[in-house]
Amino acid sequence: MATTNQLIRKGRTTLVEKSKVPALKACPQRRGVCTRVYTTTPKKPNSAMRKVCRVRLTSGFEVSSYIGGEGHNLQEHSVVLIRGGRVKDLPGVRYHTVRGSLDCAGVKDRNQSRSKYGAKRPKK
């Protein structure tokens, strides 16, 4: 416990919360250009080929971003929108690409959770 005199001299320091998505620079999303589109394997108990792209953002950062959903149309110079949100079993992937925005097409034949994958409402 600090004495009154110590508190007068120094005061209490407030803990500064570190951002989990520093590349977004306090914005909800950021635009960027794909520099590399590739697949990678997840951490130990899981097994898959996860689709990931390396993106150079307008904020100057270059980050890895996960491409959710089944199938995608991204290539090297595609312009994509990035949001925060990590992928637990891919180390270093702290961002998601927004499907159905800019050059990233929505998921085809998606009927549930459509808004998360940029899919339009199917015709009856």
Curated annotation (Swiss-Prot):
UniProt keyword terms in alphabetical order: Methylation, Ribonucleoprotein, Ribosomal protein, RNA-binding, rRNA-binding, tRNA-binding
Modified sites of kind 3-methylthioaspartic acid: D89
UniProt cross-references to Pfam families, sorted A to Z: Ribosom_S12_S23
PROSITE patterns given in the database record: RIBOSOMAL_S12
InterPro entries: NA-bd_OB-fold (IPR012340), Ribosomal_uS12 (IPR006032), Ribosomal_uS12_bac (IPR005679)
Entry-linked Gene3D superfamilies: Nucleic acid-binding proteins
Gene Ontology molecular function: any one: rRNA binding
Biological process, per Gene Ontology: translation
Cellular component aspect of the GO annotation: small ribosomal subunit
Subunit organization: Part of the 30S ribosomal subunit. Contacts proteins S8 and S17. May interact with IF1 in the 30S initiation complex.
Family: Belongs to the universal ribosomal protein uS12 family.
PANTHER family documented for this protein: 30S RIBOSOMAL PROTEIN S12 FAMILY MEMBER (PTHR11652)
Protein function: With S4 and S5 plays an important role in translational accuracy.
Protein name: Small ribosomal subunit protein uS12
Source organism per UniProt: Acinetobacter baumannii (strain AB0057)
Name of the encoding gene: rpsL
